[in-house]
Regions:
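Internal helix-turn-beta structural module
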Residues: 9, 311-372
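Glycine-rich, mobile lid/loop segments that gate access to catalytic sites or pores
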Residues: 112-230
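Glycine-rich anion/phosphate-binding loop at the beta-strand->alpha-helix junction
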Residues: 13-19, 133, 210-327
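A short glycine/serine-rich beta->alpha loop
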Residues: 9-14, 117-128, 227-231, 287-292, ...
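Glycine-rich, N-terminal phosphate-binding loop and its surrounding beta-alpha-beta segment
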Residues: 42-102, 106
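Short acidic, glycine/tyrosine-flanked loop/strand segments centered on an H-E-D-like triad
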Residues: 97-122, 319-336
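N-terminal, positively charged regions that mediate nucleic acid binding
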Residues: 1-57
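Alpha-helical support elements that line or immediately flank enzyme active sites
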Residues: 19-31, 126-152, 235-243, 300-302, ...
Length: 372
């Protein structure tokens, strides 16, 4: 499917080396004032060619809105937009039309459709995520107006780990940690800790120079969510969020809160105790559940991690097959990211925003219906 969401639906179209990519965001409420500069900033964060740690492909990523906006405000009608492709070098892929690239969708797309576009991965290219970032930036603005703040950051690349427990596990952030989170985009490596960012940069550079690629983990924290978002059983916020993250190119793992670590613990240590606040409310003392119980938000920070595999396109020689079954070897040329996780941080934020705004609108629709 090329459409994501229920009440708020994003449909994307286009290929990596086609003339353009685009999207239609349907269900966005009318009358909301759009900040186009914020959209441009989100796109800049995703953009390649800004350093030698990312792909040299540099697109302008200028958004052309075709419908759904008038005088800077949403109309409540479908918001359609396109982003032109200009910096394509399709000749780099001419030798791949009869090969199956290891780790790519060549084999599966051929098996499903009987025809595929090998240029940059076609529809399966991470270039498609530029559409998600535009739509996600619109949703992020709407959520911020509701007091919801999404902060994703790089917490691991290869063997380099950032100890982010003070950001990921805290119920309430200190003012210093809030500033730290806001600083994550001030360097090329979007990690709040500058020392760790430098170590990550060195690891990526070493990998690039060896014509290889490396994986990473992106952590995300959402503050300001009210209790009650999500549906029981088959439409949990956790399951929808997992679908959103695993739908990102190269995503290979997902966990809410402490996730897989809880599998080796006892309930006595895994449970988050409830405690009264000074204001007379109730909150958790810890947040190992990641802010969700039964797939429904409880007013605590929503925390999750997404793991990304190493980029499939590498310069090292790999064994593969031609489409006729002949064994051969392959060294991929062209322009590729040595670590996709570096540019995936704003994509994680975008998909989070799309998911959460959809749940907000559903929650309000149900509440209105119940009031009659």
């Amino acid at each position: 499917m090329n459409t994501f969401g229920r009440l708020l639906r994003l449909t994307s179209f286009g290929e990596s080396h086609g003339p353009a990519l685009g999207g239609v965001l349907d269900g966005f409420p009318a009358g909301f004032a759009i900040d186009e500069a914020a959209i441009e900033e989100a796109l800049r964060r995703r953009q390649g060619g800004r350093s030698d740690l990312t792909t040299p492909r540099r697109e302008s990523d200028k958004v052309h809105f075709l419908s759904g906006l008038y005088e800077g405000r949403t109309l409540g009608t479908p918001i359609a937009f396109v982003i032109d492709n200009a910096d394509t070098r399709s000749q780099d892929y001419s030798q791949l039309s009869d090969l199956y690239r290891p780790g790519h969708t060549d084999f599966t797309y051929q098996a499903k459709y009987g025809h595929r576009d090998p240029r940059g991965g076609g529809r399966a290219s991470a270039r498609e995520t530029v559409v998600r970032v535009v739509a996600g930036a619109l949703c992020d603005q709407w959520l911020r107006a509701e007091g919801v703040h999404i902060s994703a950051y790089l917490s691991q690349v290869g063997a380099v780990h950032y100890d982010d427990s003070h950001l990921y596990e805290a119920i309430h952030l200190t003012e210093g940690d809030k500033v730290l989170l806001q600083s994550r985009y001030e360097q090329i490596v979007p990690c709040p800790d500058k020392a760790t960012a430098e170590r990550i940069a060195a690891a990526v550079a070493e990998t690039r120079d060896s014509r290889d690629s490396i994986g990473g983990v992106i952590s995300c924290r959402v503050d300001g969510l009210p209790a009650g978002l999500g549906e029981p059983l088959y439409d949990k916020l956790s399951s929808r969020l997992a679908s959103a993250m695993m739908g990102i190119n190269a995503a290979r793992g997902f966990e809410i809160g402490d996730g897989f670590a809880l599998a080796s613990e006892y309930g006595s240590s895994a449970n988050d105790p409830f405690v009264p606040t000074e204001a007379g409310a109730i909150e958790q003392q810890t947040n190992r559940c990641g802010g969700l119980l039964g797939g429904i938000s409880m007013g605590a920070p929503l925390t999750f991690r997404t793991a990304f595999k190493p980029t499939s396109s590498i310069g090292r020689e790999q064994m593969t097959c031609r489409t006729d079954g002949t064994l051969t070897s392959l060294s991929i040329t062209g322009r590729h990211d040595p670590c996709v996780a570096l540019r995936a941080v704003p994509i994680v934020e975008a998909m989070t925003a799309l998911t959460l705004m959809d749940f907000y609108l559903l929650h309000r629709a149900y509440s209105t219906a119940e009031r009659g």
